[in-house]
Amino acid sequence: MSNSSFHNKRRDFVKQSSMLAGAIAAAPIISRANFFSGSDDVIKVAVIGCGGRGTGAAVQALSSKQNVKIVAMADAFRDRLDDCYKNVSAELANQGAGAKGSIDVPEERKFVGFDAYLKAIPLADVVILATPPGFRPIHFEEAVKQGKHIFMEKPVATDPAGVQRVLAAAKIAKQKKLNVVVGLQRHYQDSYRALFAKKDIIGDITSMQAWWNNDGVWVRPRKAGQTEMEYQMRNWYYFVWLCGDHITEQHIHNLDVINWFKGGYPVKAQGFGGRQVRKSKEHGEIFDHHYVEYHYADGSILNSQCRHMPGTSSKVDELFVGTKGKIHCDAGRITDLHGKTLFQYDKSKERNPYQTEHDELFAAIAKGEYKFADAENGAYSTMTSILGRMATYSGQIIDWDKAINSGLDLHPSVYAFDAAAPVNPGPDGFYPVAVPGVTKY
């Protein structure tokens, strides 16, 4: 990757954040009575982003045992919207007469294009934000401005500029008492909640490990006639402005657990990474492996690794080592330092956390309760992953404060399929890729 491809776009964030907060705050604080008057009323939902995760979240919303109705859908691509509508409708039909949720999205409430979210959000009480994460900040801002409750998928940004926008909007969401749940579902997973409640058993946490190692994800090949912007939008996982690299899009789950149990965020990071296996033209500009050493304010260190390499061993887990014991997260177990079990969660009792997060969100909305304010933590855990990416791309020690205030903005100035993409391939068809020791931040 050339330096110019990932340069810092310096912005006056004090001015920008103040203007943004003022604009969002200027929108009226919507009372419960204005948009939802009681437990027997329909809770109207708009789905923004109709890919796999948007489809899954829509089904989970409809399965929440509340009177939920999907009334609008929005996506950049018509075929993705149509697939989502078909699949959600089929799942609802499979639930049979016992289904309480419903879908009512006629043609006039199916919106396509980069601006589709602006047309769908006003029609709903709750919005599901499930586009590629590069769009999350602008969609979250708009939903907060319009006074909507929100479920938004992780990560909530792909660069520090986006993190700043989410943090500014999160403050306004709290003022408006808008419930916001972020899809870091381990916070809603029974075994993790039980481990968190008993974490003091291991004494002071001195070190941590986190893994997301597996084969990787899909590839969507370039098709004839696609503009560069359309191709990147279709194959979004492999472009940093849209995905954030897999350390951000996927490994954020593990990093978030570490932050949660630690009760704080890292102060600096250093690491390494690269592309050894996944390095064809269709693999864009992201790495296939990252290793990051995160330092926390109390001196404890997290050793973090994520890898996308077919045929290698798989592991998705977190481990905490304390002065008196260890927490083995995936196993739901706490042991002493010699391996003796001190606590074991009964995994047979575990509910589906993807469903639980929707059950709890929609139950709160149905009761007129303000219970969830996940956006700030979602932004800071997103920034944790971005900090690691900045360290692996550059090969340098990256300070948290400098990184989050860097002004790094990877996004295009214009969103349109015929607009210039933020990064372009060279004459050989390959995209520029970060080079540790050369790439600067």
Predicted regions, residues:
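N-terminal Rossmann-like dinucleotide-binding module
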Residues: 20-100, 258, 438-441
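A structured beta-alpha segment of the ubiquitous adenosine-cofactor-binding alpha/beta core
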Residues: 92-129
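C-terminal helical cap and adjacent loop that interface with cofactors, partners, or active-site loops
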Residues: 17, 22, 56, 249, ...
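N-terminal secretory signal peptides and thylakoid transit peptides that target proteins
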Residues: 2-21
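N-terminal glycine-rich "phosphate-gripper" loop used for MgATP/nucleotide binding
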Residues: 131-134
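Predominantly a Rossmann-like dinucleotide-binding segment in NAD(P)-dependent oxidoreductases
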Residues: 49-53, 174-182, 186-284, 310-312, ...
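Beta-strand-loop-alpha-helix segment that lines the small-molecule cofactor/substrate pocket
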Residues: 126, 137-186
